[in-house]
Every structure is written in structure tokens, then in C-alpha cells.
């Protein structure tokens, strides 16, 4: 299947921010910024167990919010800093709606929205 008929998405993410890029309309290959999602992180709590549970819950909410901006993924490329990309790929694989999506990843530094869009577009072309 050519990329023209696929729903292609890209995400730049770190532990606190994500930028979602995709081909919004079927039939167009033009990538555009679909949205931004922020993860404020856990509050400062002296109880380590509570803090850990809060971080897990907030990360899950962060992933869910990102995924909600990308219905029916055929292919996704996830890039960013750290190891959060692998966690997000695992989340997608465990979510029935996204489990058949082809996911790839890379590591990259923070970029402007325009550079993220160009980076993802270049990846799929």
C-alpha cells in the first residue's frame, strides 16, 4: 500500500511535552501539526509511593491524550529525547485500536514545530 492511502503520524515527545504531526485528510500527503499535549508531572509529595503512583497515572493520561489526536493509525514515527518513546510504543501496542500500527522510533533533540513537521515528512518520503 502506498503512503497516499495510509494514515501517517509522527510524534516528538519528551516526558513533559508532545507535538503531534500527521496527514489529516485522506488523499493528501501534506503533513501538518495536529496538536500539542503537555504532561505537568507529579506534584511534590513526600510520600514516595504516592508520587510513583501519581507519575504512572499522569504518564498514562499523557499517552491517552496523545493517542486521541491520532485516530486509526497505519504508521507512526516517534522521536524525542530520553526513553519515553519506547514507553509510548508499548502503550500503543497494548491498546486494541493501535496494536496493528507500524511504529518506528528515533532520538532527536527539541525542535521547532516546522522542523518537527519537516523531520516526520522526510521520514515517510
Put a short name on every predicted segment:
Residues 1-125:
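Terminal alpha-helical anchor/extension segments at protein ends
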Amino acid at each position: 500500500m502506498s503512503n497516499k492511502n495510509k494514515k501517517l503520524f509522527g510524534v516528538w515527545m519528551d516526558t513533559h511535552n508532545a507535538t503531534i504531526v500527521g496527514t489529516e485528510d485522506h488523499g493528501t500527503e501534506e503533513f501538518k501539526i495536529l496538536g500539542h499535549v503537555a504532561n505537568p508531572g507529579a506534584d511534590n509529595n513526600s510520600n514516595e509511593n504516592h508520587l510513583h503512583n501519581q507519575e504512572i497515572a499522569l504518564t498514562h493520561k499523557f499517552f491517552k491524550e496523545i493517542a486521541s489526536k491520532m485516530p486509526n493509525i497505519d504508521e507512526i514515527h516517534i522521536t524525542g529525547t530520553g526513553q519515553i518513546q519506547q514507553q509510548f510504543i508499548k502503550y500503543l501496542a497494548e491498546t486494541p485500536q493501535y496494536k496493528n500500527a507500524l511504529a518506528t522510533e528515533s532520538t532527536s533533540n527539541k525542535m521547532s514545530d516546522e522542523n518537527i513537521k519537516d523531520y516526520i515528512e522526510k521520514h515517510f518520503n
